[in-house]
C-alpha cells in the first residue's frame, strides 16, 4: 500500500468487500498522526489484476522480533476480502499469499479479523483459512440484539430487570 492507493483502498473496503467497515478505510486510519505507527498495510491482487483483498497492518517490535499485526489504529482489521471471495479456497489463497509475504520480512503475525456481527457476508471461510494454516484464535464474546420492528418498550421488556438500568 502507498498513499496514492487511498481512493482504491477505501472504495474496495466500503463497496466491494464482504467484511470491511469504515474502521479499515484509509480515511479512518489516517486520522492518527503520521509516524505514530509504522504502516505495513498490503493490497492483494488476483491473477487478473483485480484487487482481491486489503490488509490494514502495522509493524510492531517486541525486542528484536518484527511482528506484522492488524493496524493498531483500528479496533479490528485482519484481511478484508472481496465480497465474492467466500470460499475456503479463495480465503486460503489470499491468506497464504499474505503469509508468504510476511515470512520474508517479519518474524510473526497477529491478526484481529472483523467480528461476524459486522461482516456484510458470512465469513466462515476466512475463519477456516486461519485454522487451516495453523493460526491460533482468540475468541471474544460479543452480543447483539436485533432491533428491527421493535419499539423501545418491547426491547427493554426483553432484558432482565436488573439489566434494564444498564441499557437506559
Segments (PLM) and residue ranges:
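Acidic-and-aromatic substrate-binding clefts and catalytic sites of carbohydrate-active enzymes
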Residues: 117-121
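Generic beta-strand structural signal
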Residues: 77, 107-109, 139-143
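Short amphipathic alpha-helix that is part of the acyltransferase structural core
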Residues: 1-27, 165-168
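Acyltransferase donor/substrate-recognition loop-hinge adjacent to the catalytic core
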Residues: 1-6, 124-168
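Conserved GNAT acetyl-CoA-binding A-motif
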Residues: 104-115
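Short, charge-rich binding segments
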Residues: 99-104, 133-136
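Conserved donor-binding loop and adjoining core beta-sheet/short helix segment
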Residues: 11-14, 27-100
Amino acid at each position: 500500500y502507498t498513499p496514492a492507493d487511498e481512493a482504491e483502498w477505501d472504495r474496495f473496503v466500503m463497496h466491494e468487500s464482504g467484511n470491511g467497515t469504515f474502521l479499515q478505510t484509509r480515511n479512518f486510519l489516517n486520522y492518527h498522526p503520521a509516524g505514530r505507527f509504522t504502516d505495513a498495510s498490503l493490497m492483494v491482487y488476483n491473477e487478473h489484476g483485480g484487487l482481491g483483498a486489503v490488509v490494514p497492518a502495522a509493524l510492531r517490535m517486541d525486542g528484536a522480533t518484527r511482528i506484522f499485526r492488524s493496524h493498531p489504529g483500528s479496533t479490528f482489521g485482519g484481511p478484508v476480502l472481496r465480497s465474492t471471495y467466500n470460499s475456503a479456497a479463495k480465503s486460503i489463497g489470499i491468506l497464504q499469499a499474505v503469509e508468504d509475504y510476511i515470512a520474508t520480512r517479519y518474524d510473526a503475525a497477529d491478526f484481529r479479523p472483523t467480528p461476524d456481527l459486522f461482516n456484510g457476508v458470512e465469513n466462515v471461510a476466512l475463519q477456516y483459512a486461519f485454522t487451516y494454516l495453523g493460526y491460533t484464535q482468540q475468541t471474544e464474546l460479543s452480543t447483539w440484539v436485533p432491533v428491527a420492528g421493535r419499539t423501545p418498550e418491547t426491547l427493554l421488556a426483553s432484558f432482565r430487570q436488573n439489566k434494564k438500568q444498564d441499557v437506559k
